[in-house]
Amino acid sequence: MVSLHPLLDNGITPGSDSFPGGTLKCLCPSFPVEITLTTNVAHNHACGCSKCWKPAGALFSIVGVVPRDELSVTANGDKLAIVDESAVIQRYACKECGTHLYRRIEKEHPFYGLDFVHAELSEEEGWQEPQFAAFVSSVIEQGFDPAKIGEVRARFRELGLETYDSLSPPLMDAIAAWTGRKNGKYDLHSWLDCERRKGGGGGGQPGGVVCRL
């Protein structure tokens, strides 16, 4: 059986709609960088792109988003550095262990206002479980045997996750709507018109944030 990620290989553990957030730490054995999230992640998913941080041996990363004002660096932030300052999505990584703590967008972008994080770096339980798999075919570009990509998609389906070679349809629709609004095609709320949710809810967005068109 193909190995995807430690959080997926033994089955998916459901998260909690009422989970309030927690702390994420880098992998340094002493003085780790720590960030604190005051809400659960949303749109958590497996990602096959070459940019996302993955634990050793993992084929996919697991990444979700939180509003940027729900994230703060709470310990040893002096160890953080931006991996590529020219990139639209700036990745803040520990200079010692290389772990990516969060990604932030400072330029005009459909997802401006959201930070990307890896909830697996937390010891708390209750984070939203993965909802889908994105950029699946991208692992081929990184050296994965194309003859075995069908096994990868089949394994995701066994786990109950739909596979895409881009982001999920709701997120792709959001990008298209943002672009249409930017081009003056219609007057539309930004997809990042995010509201705090009082209590939990379904739809893949539990624990605090609602993003809508």
Curated annotation (Swiss-Prot):
Family stated for the protein in its record = Belongs to the Gfa family.
Name of the protein described by the UniProt record: Putative glutathione-dependent formaldehyde-activating enzyme
Q: Which HAMAP family match?
A: Formald_GSH
The reaction(s) catalysed by this protein are:
S-(hydroxymethyl)glutathione = glutathione + formaldehyde
Q: Name one Pfam family in it.
A: GFA
Cross-referenced SUPFAM superfamilies: Mss4-like (SSF51316)
What are the UniProt keywords, alphabetically? Lyase, Metal-binding, Zinc
Q: GO MF annotations for this entry?
A: S-(hydroxymethyl)glutathione synthase activity; zinc ion binding
Question: What cystine pairs are annotated?
Answer: none
| Species in which this protein is naturally found | Podospora anserina (strain S / ATCC MYA-4624 / DSM 980 / FGSC 10383) (Pleurage anserina)
Question: CENP-V/GFA domain: from which residue to which, for each copy?
Answer: 19-165
